[in-house]
Curated annotation (Swiss-Prot):
The gene is XAGE5. It comes from Homo sapiens. It comes from the Eukaryota. This is X antigen family member 5. Disulfide bonds: none annotated. Residues 20-108 are annotated as: Disordered. Pfam families: GAGE. InterPro entries: GAGE, GAGE_fam. Residues 40-52, 94-108 have a biased composition (Basic and acidic residues). Belongs to the GAGE family.
Length: 108
């Protein structure tokens, strides 16, 4: 008796397209059509073009001032802690006694 290996049977319940999702066809980028120049390409150093004027008007915001303003608005009081917080010392965690079973408030 000769041994026969298992024959390959494709699964019928799931298709590859269902596992992976819809296949995208590779797209070939179309060459972009350049617009014919309306003015001559010659640019003399003394002349300004319309494109150059827009670049000169861009302003960089002051990042340091913005960061300082944000940090002050998040912390609240600029001079430090408020008077009701100053002078209070938090108890150490070793001084707390937790009640049995985790019910109730911790005792000091």
């Amino acid at each position: 008796m000769s041994w026969r290996g298992r024959r390959y049977r494709p699964r019928r319940c799931l298709r590859l397209a269902q596992l992976v999702g819809p296949m995208l066809e590779p797209s070939v980028p179309e060459p972009q059509q350049e617009e014919p120049p309306t003015e001559s390409q010659d640019h003399t150093p003394g002349q300004k073009r319309e494109d150059d004027q827009g670049a000169a008007e861009i302003q960089v915001p002051n990042l340091e001032a913005d960061l300082q303003e944000l940090s002050q608005s998040k912390t609240g009081d600029e001079c430090g802690d408020s008077p009701d917080v100053q002078g209070k010392i938090l108890p150490k965690s070793e001084q707390f006694k937790m009640p049995e079973g985790g019910e109730g408030k911790p005792q000091l």
